[in-house]
Amino acid sequence: SGMTPYKDNILKTPHIAIKVPTAGGKTFIACNAIHSIFSTYDSSRPKAVVWLVPWSNLLQQTANNLSDPTHPYRQKLNTLFNHSVEVYEKESLLQGTNFNPTSVSEQLNIFVFNFSSLRINSKKKDDRKIYQQNGALEAFRDTVVEQDLVLPDTDESALINIIRSLNPLVIVDESHNAESDLSVEMLQNLNPSFVLDLTATPKKNSNIVSYVNAIELKKEHMVKLPVIVYNHSRKEEVINSALHLQRQLEQLAIQESLEGGKKIRPIILFQAQSNIKGSDNTTYQKIKEKLIELKIPEEQIKIKVSGLDELKGIDLMDENCPVRYIITVNALKEGWDCPFAYILASLADKSSAVEVEQILGRVLRQPYVLKHKEPLLNLSFVLTASAKFNETLDNIVKGLQDAGFSNKDYYAEEIITEEIPVTDKEALNRELFGGTEEVTTHFDDADITNINVDAISFDPTANEVAPIANTAISQITQKAIEEGKAFETRLTEDA
């Protein structure tokens, strides 16, 4: 029949996956799915949902959005469950804050955890408070907890046993991060009645029941497609092109705003090279130093890496926010989201396909979910200077195809400087899936410390693109507009 056999990953528990590309609204889908699933259950049973996320910042984002009465997620839940919804994080559950046998039976209860709170070797359960005796939850001992569901070597009042007795629906966000043996044990320990996976990159053992195509997202103006990918010869050129392109996009956004459009402040994501074998090449701090050396105001530059989060507490969508440049390695894959991010300027040679997809996904979300008058504001851009361009493209393509995109959703080209001997045909027609001709180029493999700022023509006080950069920017933007029109034509033809 061509249908993939069901994989019984969690014994005797329905376990399905919804594959949704980045920016595809998977959280909103999950909110609707909760109601659909519970509508098939006995109405007298408690409605408990364990919502699992892989990272702490995504946990906070999820809990906040599900709790905020003005957010579409919470508004949908309130509509579906008659405003009887309570969202809990781990600490409020452990303390029994607004959490008791009566409330549990009368409302939709959503427990938001990150994997690390629950994913623990069965021999080390004493290391987690969720597995320990809890006096604040004594009221559940004789009213909710079922004796035959109590985990070995745990007290009946432990939070884990209360959750097990509620036989919850489990939602696993970014479920491709929950494939290890410990992750399977984590799910089994919850005694789920149903497991719903949400991911852009499902693993081979996933039971995919729904697939959202990227073209449908474009038709609804949810994503910035096509992705325009350009490879440069040197890292100075990447920085130069990114800065000038950002300025051009911002000028277009300002003009559109003056004509009644929404306010947009385009942002560049600079992807730094992670340290390799103790070397310190192309690190995030050095990129920031170079941008400041170019006289870019420091308040416009923020770093977001593991261990340093200068974006904490900043609302990037606030029209008074000055941030235009964000430097990262791969921390932005962890649930970070800002529709104003338009340009990914990668100063790293390569990364894994999944990492590329997750980082590239940060520039795909369309601001305000509407089509903008200026064509360039409906596209996203990736600028690189990689000697491994073909390998980098292979990773981008593989990652995005796995995430529901196709080879019609990109345009890729190399910008070749004059001193590099290639033909016009080679320089202008290196499309992502067109031809197999190799172009020999000589890339500068120096780290960011050796970048010559004098070779970067960007002036933050000027209003025009510098002549030196104008050719490259014109090439990028003109081709982007052409590809955008071609993409729109395909959408119309497919309608």
Model features per residue range: what roles?
Residues 326-343, 361-363:
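SF2 helicase motor core recognition
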